[in-house]
UniProtKB/Swiss-Prot annotation:
Gene Ontology molecular function, alphabetical: uroporphyrinogen decarboxylase activity
SUPFAM superfamilies given in the database record: UROD/MetE-like
Subcellular localization, as worded in the UniProt entry: Cytoplasm
Gene transcribed to yield this protein: hemE
Name this protein carries in UniProt: Uroporphyrinogen decarboxylase
InterPro entries: UROD/MetE-like_sf, Uroporphyrinogen_deCO2ase_HemE, Uroporphyrinogen_deCOase
Record bears the keyword Cytoplasm: yes
UniProt-listed NCBIfam families: hemE
EC number(s) per entry: 4.1.1.37
Functional description taken from the UniProt entry: Catalyzes the decarboxylation of four acetate groups of uroporphyrinogen-III to yield coproporphyrinogen-III.
Binding site for substrate: 26-30, 45, 76, 153, 208, 323
Site (Transition state stabilizer): 76
Protein's pathway: Porphyrin-containing compound metabolism; protoporphyrin-IX biosynthesis; coproporphyrinogen-III from 5-aminolevulinate: step 4/4
Annotated organism of origin: Prochlorococcus marinus (strain SARG / CCMP1375 / SS120)
Length: 351
């Protein structure tokens, strides 16, 4: 009986469900008081994300508080980098810093293939514990950064406003960049397989910075490597739903659907009805409520969620934000988001 499986897993597979499942990107994090208290005692982000007890606890915090339909591993897209020979740190309020940015062929040649069982055992442990804890009340989600976004961080050395260093590499030394992207695609595919084998039931690939690319460059530097990751994972795990999210994706939505993923996660700058019209019927849709709406009134939050769900009616839909929840969001408004999502049928029938 598939009815005993988590709602989010069934919906992501395209099965008929009685409402869209609901979870939030970054649902474990700074907006929650319990997270901030834990952070005060453990100020290192890498410790919080790489110590299995802390990562498990943080992953479970929103589940205990809000009972979302998905529980996502608390980690970071850069977590696998040290396993490939790239050290990094995450500085509070500044973001990631790569100690030795990758700029030469010699550096690319020294990168190691990722062996997640060896370098990331804590990830497997946390995913297994999450599955044990949430049982079928929620689906356990794993995630990775896509090759272009990982390359953007390791070439730039930090977050960037215009990505001029990696774009210079793309337009001056494309062969070098392709070698780096290919290395990441193979390693990230192995990492996703490891997450699935450890307990992840649905996985999401974040290509956060692919929205900085023109469509022609998306076709050259992002899409082929997204597709390579998907193809490699689907060879061994064809039934695990895969989601692709890009921030600022309005110009490449149709291209996202061609990578082989099961679900395209829309950001909030695209009208849900237009997003649905631009995607083939076999592709599921996740999103796409503006995270800023969670600073509004409960009535406004409800209205916006109802609008989003109604526009996605008839499609395989997972209710989510169009970006991660923002720091400073009132916790009670996050609760309104989850409760509205879970009570959506009653709310729509009463309109």
């Amino acid at each position: 009986m598939t009815d005993s499986l988590p709602l989010l897993l069934r919906a992501a597979r395209g099965e008929s469900v009685n409402r869209p499942p609901v979870w939030m990107m970054r649902q474990a994090g700074r907006y929650m008081k319990v997270y901030r208290e834990l952070r005060d005692n453990h100020p290192s982000f890498r410790e919080r994300s790489e110590n299995p007890d802390l990562s498990y606890e943080i992953s479970m915090q929103p589940f205990r508080e809000f009972k979302p339909d998905g529980v996502i591993l608390f980690s970071d897209i850069l977590t696998p980098l040290p396993g490939m020979g790239i050290d990094f740190d995450i500085v509070e309020s500044k973001g990631p810093l790569i100690n030795d940015p990758i700029r030469t062929l010699e550096q690319v040649k020294t990168l190691r293939p990722l062996e997640p069982q060896v370098s990331l055992p804590f990830v497997g442990e946390v995913l297994g514990r999450l599955r044990e804890s949430v049982k079928n009340e929620a689906a356990v989600l794993g995630f990775v950064g896509a090759p272009w976004t990982l390359a953007a961080y390791v070439v730039e050395g930090k977050s960037s406003k215009n990505y001029s260093v990696i774009k210079a590499m793309a337009f001056q030394q494309p062969d070098l960049l392709h070698k780096l992207l290919n290395h990441f695609a193979e390693s990230i595919a192995n990492y996703l397989k490891y997450q699935i084998e450890s307990g992840a039931q649905v996985v999401q690939m974040f290509d956060s910075w692919a929205g900085q690319l023109s469509p022609i460059d998306y076709d050259n530097y992002a899409a082929p490597y997204q597709k390579k990751v998907v193809d490699l994972v689907k060879q061994s795990h064809p039934d695990t739903p895969m989601i692709l999210y890009i921030s600022g994706s309005a110009g490449v939505i149709e291209r996202m659907a061609k990578t082989g993923v099961d679900i395209v996660s829309l950001d909030w700058t695209v009208d849900m009805a237009e997003g649905c019209a631009r995607l083939p019927n076999n592709i599921g849709i996740q999103g796409n409520v503006d995270p800023g709406i969670l600073f509004g009134t409960p009535k406004m939050i409800q209205e916006r969620i109802i609008d989003t769900v109604k526009k996605a009616k008839g499609r395989k839909h997972i209710l989510n934000l169009g970006h991660g929840i923002l720091p400073g969001t009132p916790e009670e408004n996050a609760k309104v988001f989850f409760e509205t999502g879970k009570n959506i049928n009653n709310l729509i029938s009463n309109i």
